[in-house]
Amino acid sequence: MSEQKLALNEYLKTDSDYLRGTIKEGLDSSVTGSFSDGDQQLIKFHGFYQQDDRDLRNERKEQKLEPLYSFMLRARVPGGVCTPKQWLGVDEIASTLTSSNSIRLTTRQTFQYHGIPKRNLKTIIQGLDREALDSIAACGDVNRNVMCNPNPVESKLHAQAYEVAKKLSDHLLPHTRAYAEIWLDEEKLLTTEDETVEPVYGKTYLPRKFKMAVAVPPDNDVDVYTNDLGFIAVAENGELVGFNLTAGGGMGSTHGEVETFPRLADDFGFIKTEDVMKFAEAVMTVQRDWGNRTNRKRSRLKYTIVDHGYEKFKAEVEARAGVKFEPKRDVVIGDRGDRYGWVEGVDGKWHLTLFIESGRIKDVPGKSLQTGMREIAKIHKGDFRMTSNQNMIIAGVAPEDKATIEGLARKHGLLGQVLTQTRGHSIACVALPTCPLAMAEAERYFPEFIDHIDALQAKNGISDQAIVVRMTGCPNGCARPFAAEIGLVGKAPGRYNLYLGANFEGTRLNKMYRENIQEAEILAELDALFARYAVERNAGETFGNFTVRTGVVKAVIDAAKDFHG
């Protein structure tokens, strides 16, 4: 049998001189606001994507103008923690160098800028560098931003888990100096040993993106089972002793292609804290060597485990780590939401969690969110923690400073909004007009959609029940819709696939209930189901579990076999 041809991206990576390509030349060109096709793939490793305003695409085409190109830049902020000083720098960049004039908190605990003209990219990256921030490996076929539960109650355990997340992020960064040379004007160093440039990744990096999270039970706001690699903290007497390791999660799929599917990670066993780096590197290098490099739609770790088998994969990871898994420890995985309002930590400091709808921090009529965050940053003595639910925690507030912080938050609309249980558990991706993959609206439409859900819950007397609702403009799954009790995935403008049946804790996927339907049909279906749920539910039964128990949808047990079936 002839050898299969590699995916185009593999050749691009091989020939890129460790992610340099012709990015520098493209950056210097004023002929177009775009990069070349090849460099558009390489710039992802540097932390940004090329986009254009799709609302204006046809108009500009009629005017014989190229699309209004801009860039989305995503920062690397392991664990989502930054200082007030850093935030002021982040805010200044958003206000002066982007057309969106906003900061977008992401579902992976970092922030994005939208609407960056090519000419401003270098200035922005240098501005982030001055604040000890960067965007390297925030995108691309590498380990992405490492998530970690903010967990403001168990501060000591959070601090230990956060240190692990930071070490994972730093240890698994690409070693190439391309980022420093192109964006920070550092000199290129001569090298003769190809593979020593990237001791973990090698010349072709990973077959596909790689996502990692550290969870601190009982919280699961990081949706640990949706990640390629997860570490679930195990504590004894309040001290971190190790982790249950999970591997093989991932949300992305392609409409109509049954060989692609979302998947939740498998449990592999317990590892000691001192062995975390060994196992992380072992899992990544197995994926590097075994992952599919011919078909990018089947290149994630989840498919590697499915194709090679759990036991074979586990044995290879143990062999490379030089350590065997112990039986997994018992831990309780619970709520995926954030604790809104004030929460006192074990150290006597207070933490204020702010609900940021769809993560968009921007001044709009009636809500000066960006100004409010800026004013808080000017006086705050603790830190800021971005959550994977697109929210913000003002962390480490002394008791005597609470009133001032709360006053600013209320003045600028960061506090005081009516927040239902379901809205507090809802997230959406950006989608239109900037995301090139979006087939339907998400962020711009989602607040209105949640208004409808809230009204239906109130009508049926179930407003006290939190339901995890998520919406994306395409099946790539950035807002993790396939792990939502109600998931909406864009199929075409104004049309979505409706998924039901994931559980509240995030340990079971949902399943398609209705395909390619519009708002009126979606709401009619949910109204009928809410009416049944109100009278037929068992005590304490969540909506997702109800839809499975009553046969509305079948439980997804093995995604490779039954997600589409």
UniProtKB/Swiss-Prot annotation:
Ligand binding (siroheme): C478
GO cellular component labels: sulfite reductase complex (NADPH)
Keywords linked to the UniProt accession: 4Fe-4S, Amino-acid biosynthesis, Cysteine biosynthesis, Heme, Iron, Iron-sulfur, Metal-binding, NADP, Oxidoreductase
Pathway membership: Sulfur metabolism; hydrogen sulfide biosynthesis; hydrogen sulfide from sulfite (NADPH route): step 1/1
Gene Ontology MF terms: 4 iron, 4 sulfur cluster binding; heme binding; metal ion binding; NADP binding; sulfite reductase (ferredoxin) activity; sulfite reductase (NADPH) activity
EC number of the protein: 1.8.1.2
PANTHER family: SULFITE REDUCTASE [NADPH] SUBUNIT BETA, SULFITE REDUCTASE [NADPH] SUBUNIT BETA-RELATED
Gene3D superfamilies documented for this protein: Sulfite Reductase Hemoprotein, domain 1
UniProt name for this protein: Sulfite reductase [NADPH] hemoprotein beta-component
Lineage of the species this protein comes from: Bacteria, Pseudomonadati, Pseudomonadota, Gammaproteobacteria, Alteromonadales
Cofactor: record remark: Binds 1 siroheme per subunit.
Cofactor(s) the record lists: siroheme; [4Fe-4S] cluster
One BP annotation, GO: sulfate assimilation
Designated gene of the protein: cysI
Record-linked InterPro entries: CysI (IPR011786), NiRdtase/SiRdtase_haem-b_fer (IPR005117), Nit/Sulf_reduc_fer-like_dom_sf (IPR036136), NO2/SO3_Rdtase_4Fe4S_dom (IPR006067), NO2/SO3_Rdtase_4Fe4S_prot (IPR045169), NO2/SO3_Rdtase_4Fe4S_sf (IPR045854), NO2/SO3_Rdtase_FeS/sirohaem_BS (IPR006066)
Keyword 4Fe-4S: yes
Protein family according to the UniProt entry: Belongs to the nitrite and sulfite reductase 4Fe-4S domain family.
Annotated function: Component of the sulfite reductase complex that catalyzes the 6-electron reduction of sulfite to sulfide. This is one of several activities required for the biosynthesis of L-cysteine from sulfate.
Organism: Shewanella sp. (strain ANA-3)
Pfam family, one: NIR_SIR
Subunit structure of this chain's protein: Alpha(8)-beta(8). The alpha component is a flavoprotein, the beta component is a hemoprotein.
Reactions accelerated catalytically: hydrogen sulfide + 3 NADP(+) + 3 H2O = sulfite + 3 NADPH + 4 H(+)
